[in-house]
Design a protein with these regions (language model features):
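Short amphipathic beta-strand starts and helix->beta connectors
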Residues: 145-146, 296-303, 347-357, 388-390, ...
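Conserved, structured C-terminal
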Residues: 226-254, 260-262, 289, 363-647
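C-terminal catalytic lobe of FAD-dependent flavoproteins
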Residues: 62, 71, 97, 101-233
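Flavin-dependent oxidoreductases
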Residues: 1-105, 112-117, 121-129, 207-229, ...
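Acidic, proline/glycine-enriched N-terminal capping motif
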Residues: 198-345
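Internal amphipathic helical hairpin motif
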Residues: 321-356, 409-441
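Well-ordered mid-protein domain cores that form the structural environment of catalytic cofactors
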Residues: 329, 333-390
């Protein structure tokens, strides 16, 4: 019918979306998968129903099934059968399909067990001999590698948007949110976890899409532990430290397809060293995907030094004419700083809420290096690239560089034994970076800290990473160095300092002011979200990010329980806490504080409850535990004066 010229296209073609996207040179990483459903009836129990739907849907989470009344019939759907995947190219055409292209022939063997479960659940409805199967299909729906929708502008093609992997329950909301995003530049609700730009190239491979989608299918109604790790398609991205880490008994979690140590079995000996300072979790649920070794590694870092594999960072350069303009526009903090300065900055949405937080190193007049979290790194890089003026290039360096973190009171002594460079506080101040020589390596060292200790991030080309590890490890032996995992870096060390994390405390639901991160002054240069941020500064916050400690862990059974995150925070009388914006208070992060001997929680509270010493409750698995507000700003509960970081 001819061509239509347009600047914007939205692909919302369901299971055909990948096929359509490839026509434009983009990737929509989903796979069609079978969801079995049967329609039985007429059901005598429903003979007097007048409407299509008069009874509530029943979700039987234990059997991964649902039952839904439909007129005089009953639909029974299942997520318990084996994962049955298809390729978009193999979906039959309208002419080839017996029913419709997404309604494939029913495979009865896959549903026999589910039918038995449905009969056990509602025998009064299904046991009548007059009830027969009216309709049975292997229907196709869309699965993604992480189980979330694929929304937003594709990173490959400007103006090509995706609204794919959207199930029926999400459809109306997604339509509204996508319209807002396209017209206003952001949706009203937080869709960052569903941003199609979140994937790295290796995560878009057919093998990964199918493996992760198959693994995730049976978890649709499953009980998934907050820290549960993927089992399929592992060891895709390996840091140069990987073999050393394996030899030390590293327990690997995955981050942006990288294998990253969470703790090291070789540090079990530290449990005896620190003894009663380390708590042991008694309940099986919160002991999953956790080890007391994490707390031991934490204490070894606080007392001596620890080294961390930070290769999963996403690293990209903004370089060329207009680079300063680009980073000023995207970053909230002042970027027009001296060469060698390191700036931590929030990245805001137009409405002044959080789009990310990251660090930026100024390496030259028009050369900036951005370091951000691996999980949202690709979306961050796209955001900078979207706002880069002509002549400015955004270059992904993630696979070209590796990062080793070294922190603890002995870290300066360790580096000093390897270099002639001045590593003193005067010679290498906090918040600066520069090239140093460690033995035969030239290393970009950045003096910042996410764990509240003196130390540096050390960057080298990835092929030099093994040498860097060996140098620091050997030099550290005389100082009692320990390898430490992300359990310390991302949880215990961070929480003791009350450092905020994107995706936990920082997201599109809260503002900089509410997060307690208001800078003393606002830079003169314009930046995305500035107008909204100025309004927020002039108004009292509707919520305050606080740090709380748990005062008593004892459950009704006498067993001590430890919160994992996302639990409701309640008033002392057990009533819900809801701020003036309608947001309920809940735990954004939870974890041990080994240095203070307390379990630490972070949560946004209504201002009237955000008082130091305020006694509240946290609800965990149906029971309530007493908690106390210990900070109502960004001051750490450990080393509040920051003397260790700036030693």
């Amino acid at each position: 019918r001819g061509d239509i010229a347009t600047d914007t296209i939205v692909i919302c073609c369901g299971v055909w979306s990948p096929k359509v996207a490839r026509m434009a040179g983009a990737s929509i990483p989903l796979t069609p998968a079978v969801h079995q459903m049967i329609d039985v009836g007429p059901v005598p129990h429903f003979k007097d129903t007048k409407g299509v739907i008069e009874f509530p849907i029943v979700r039987d989470m234990d059997t991964n099934m649902y039952e839904r009344q439909d007129g005089s019939g009953l639909e029974i759907g299942s997520y318990a059968h084996r994962a049955i995947l298809h390729d978009p190219e193999d979906i039959p055409s309208n002419d080839e399909a017996a029913l419709s292209p997404t309604e494939l022939p029913f495979t009865q063997d896959d549903f026999d067990k589910q039918m038995e479960d449905a009969l056990e659940l509602i025998p009064d409805v299904l046991n009548d001999e007059s009830v027969g199967i009216k309709y049975a299909i292997n229907g196709l729906l869309s699965l993604t590698p992480d189980g979330l929708p694929l929304l937003g502008e594709t990173p490959e093609v400007k103006g090509l948007w995706s609204a794919a992997a959207v199930w029926v329950k999400e459809g109306p909301g997604v339509g509204k949110a996508m319209a807002e995003w396209m017209v206003r530049g952001e949706p009203e609700i937080d869709l960052q976890s569903s941003d199609i730009a979140r994937f790295y190239d290796c995560q878009k491979s057919r093998a990964n899409i199918r493996a992760r989608s198959a693994e995730g299918f049976n978890k649709t109604y499953g009980i998934v532990h907050p820290a549960e790790q993927w089992e399929s398609n592992r060891e895709v991205r390996l840091s140069p430290f990987y073999e050393r880490e394996k030899a030390l008994g590293a327990v690997f979690y995955e981050a942006a397809a990288w294998e990253r140590p969470h703790w090291y079995a070789s540090n079990e000996k530290l449990l005896d060293e620190f003894g009663d300072q380390i708590n042991r979790r008694e309940a099986e649920w919160e002991s999953r995907w956790w080890s007391p070794i994490i707390n031991a590694e934490h204490l070894a870092m606080r007392e001596r030094a620890a080294m961390f594999d930070l290769t999963a960072f996403c690293i990209f350069d903004v370089i060329g004419p207009g680079a300063l303009e680009c980073v000023q526009t995207v970053s909230m903090r002042q970027m027009d700083v001296g060469h060698g300065k390191v700036v931590y900055t929030p990245v805001l949405s137009p409405s002044g809420t959080f789009k990310s937080d990251l660090t930026v190193m100024r390496l030259g007049d028009e050369h900036f290096r951005v370091v951000t979290g691996g999980a949202h790194g690709m979306a961050d890089m796209k955001w900078y690239a979207d706002h880069a003026p002509a002549g400015t290039t955004v270059i992904d360096l993630t696979s070209g560089w590796t990062t080793l973190g070294l922190w603890g009171p002995r870290s300066r002594d360790i580096l000093a034994s390897l270099t002639r460079d001045d590593m003193s506080h005067a010679g290498f101040p906090f918040g600066t970076c520069r090239m140093i020589e460690l033995d035969s390596l030239r290393v970009l060292a950045s003096r910042i800290s996410y764990v509240g200790e003196l130390g540096w991030e050390l960057y080298v080309p990835i092929e030099q990473g093994a040498k860097l590890w060996d140098l620091v490890w050997e030099a550290g032996q005389a100082h009692g160095i320990a390898p430490a995992g992300i359990g310390v870096y991302g949880t215990t060390g961070r929480l003791e300092k009350c450092y905020r994390a994107f995706g936990f405390e920082l997201d599109a639901d809260f503002t900089v002011v509410e997060a307690g991160m208001t800078p003393p002054k606002v830079k003169g240069a314009d930046f995305i979200g500035k107008e909204a941020h100025l309004r927020h500064r002039d108004s009292d916050p509707l919520a305050v990010l606080c740090t709380l400690t748990v005062e008593d862990h004892t459950s009704s059974s006498g067993q001590k329980r430890y919160m994992l995150g996302r639990e409701p925070i309640l008033a002392k009388d057990g009533s819900r806490l809801v701020d003036a914006h309608g947001r309920g208070s809940y735990v954004t992060s939870a974890g041990a504080g080994p240095s203070i001997g307390k379990h630490i929680l972070m949560a946004y509270l209504p201002p009237e409850n955000a008082n130091i010493g305020e006694e509240l409750l946290v609800e965990y698995l149906g029971e309530q535990y007493p908690v106390t507000v210990v900070t109502n700003d960004a001051t750490g509960v450990f080393d509040p004066e920051n003397t260790k970081v700036r030693a």
